[in-house]
From Swiss-Prot:
Species this protein is from: Medicago sativa
Stated name of the protein: Chalcone synthase 1
GO molecular function: naringenin-chalcone synthase activity
Range of residues in the leader sequence: none
GO biological process: flavonoid biosynthetic process; polyketide biosynthetic process
Acyltransferase among keywords: yes
Keyword annotations from UniProtKB, A to Z: Acyltransferase, Flavonoid biosynthesis, Transferase
Pathway involvement of the protein, from the record: Secondary metabolite biosynthesis; flavonoid biosynthesis
Chain's role: The primary product of this enzyme is 4,2',4',6'-tetrahydroxychalcone (also termed naringenin-chalcone or chalcone) which can under specific conditions spontaneously isomerize into naringenin.
Length: 389
């Protein structure tokens, strides 16, 4: 008779979880950051708030963002004037948009990832869908299953309202699924859209204005699996270790609340300080077992919540400017896309590594770290190992 231990052993994969393919997608509507304050104050009928507009212009100028992509066009906003007010009841209108566009943009990214993977979609065994944009039943995971024509018995996981750290969360979950289910191929999708958070300016709630200066729309998809099939599946990164922690004394640093007026965000001024204060401990826990203490010797993928967070992390750890190059590039070209950001950075890094003729997908280095920061204040850590190009 076969023992439970033997059954469990047979169910597990042999090797580490690997990222086998990456796809990204954005709405067609591109917004230039330099002209966004004019558009934003005009469409929200707030042009009379001259001092506030000047303050918002300075926020945009300091954001290090060149452009963002947004589903919300001038035409859509004119058709939904209550979305343009600061706290007008508008949840139904926001939800009606989000439940359609979130899975649709996720599909665009997923199709690209599946194409790069090169295997039939019938081999997908698990689906993880993550969004902070809208809530519905059945969820965006169900809608994507239908849009892609996946098998009805694909094992689905729907993650709502996680926020900006969730790019790390989906990798942690995908790693566990791939390594504990032999032959599993996990489709991971993060799709984020701004209809739930867009609103007019407020003189008294400047943290809301910070979000309006930073957030953009985007979706990213990955195929994750262990024991890649030789000559058919080509891993891009290996996921070696993950951790999840709540930073001490950080309650209320970042939080969001779903109200009749949509999803409202609240930020403390010292979020960059809280992140930089706690990142050293996270790195020691992750890299001490590998005998790595020089954090300039690894590649970096950090959620770009804003330039201040990246600046303080660099200063705290003495990082060279090039360490955050891929992260800053994604922030510049797309803005803060919440959970999707770190997956965009993974894609950016592996592409630039190939273009530059480097020896590995991690900027020529072997080891790297991926950080997600978000509500809680929650920190997700993923230790990555690059793959030879």
């Amino acid at each position: 008779m076969v023992s439970v231990a033997e059954i469990r052993q047979a169910q597990r994969a042999e090797g580490p979880a690997t990222i086998m393919a990456i796809g990204t997608a954005n709405p067609a509507n591109c917004v230039e950051q330099s002209t966004y304050p004019d558009f934003y104050f005009k469409i929200t009928n707030s042009e009379h708030k001259v001092e506030l507009k000047e303050k918002f212009q300075r926020m945009c100028d300091k954001s290090m963002i060149k452009r963002r992509y947004m589903y919300l066009t001038e035409e859509i906003l004119k058709d939904n004037p209550r979305v343009c007010e600061y706290m007008a009841p508008s949840l139904a209108a926001r939800q009606d948009m989000a439940v359609v566009v979130v899975p649709r943009l996720g599909k665009e990214a997923a199709v690209k990832a599946i194409k790069e993977w090169g295997q039939p979609k019938s081999k997908i065994t698990h689906l993880i869908f993550c969004t902070t944009s809208g809530v519905d039943m059945p969820g965006a995971d169900y809608q994507l299953t239908k849009l892609l024509g996946l098998r009805p018995y694909v094992k689905r996981y729907m993650m709502y309202q996680q926020g900006c750290f969730a790019g790390g969360t989906v990798l942690r979950l995908a790693k566990d699924l791939a390594e504990n289910n032999k032959g599993a191929r996990v489709l991971v999708v993060c799709s984020e859209e701004t209809p739930v958070t867009f609103r007019g300016p407020s003189d008294t709630h400047l943290d809301s204005l910070v979000g309006q200066a930073l957030f953009g729309d985007g979706a990213a998809a990955l195929i994750v699996g262990s024991d890649p099939i030789p000559e058919i599946e080509k891993p891009i990164f290996e996921m070696v270790w993950t951790a999840h922690t709540i930073a001490p004394d950080s309650e209320g640093a970042i939080d969001g609340h779903l109200r009749e007026a949509g999803l409202t965000f609240h930020l403390l001024k010292d979020v960059p300080g809280i992140v930089s204060k706690n990142i050293d401990k996270a790195l020691i826990e992750a890299f001490q077992p590998l005998n790595i203490s020089d954090y300039n010797s690894i590649f970096w993928i950090a959620h770009p919540g804003g330039p201040a967070i990246l600046d303080q992390v660099e200063e705290k750890l003495g990082l060279k400017p090039e360490k955050m190059k891929a992260t800053r590039e994604v922030l510049s070209e797309y803005g803060n896309m919440s959970s999707a950001c770190v997956l965009f950075i993974l894609d950016e890094m592996r592409k630039k590594s190939v273009q530059a003729g480097l020896k590995t997908t991690g900027e020529g280095l072997d080891w790297g770290v991926l950080f997600g920061f978000g509500p809680g204040l929650t920190i997700e850590t993923v230790v990555l190992h690059s793959v030879a190009i």
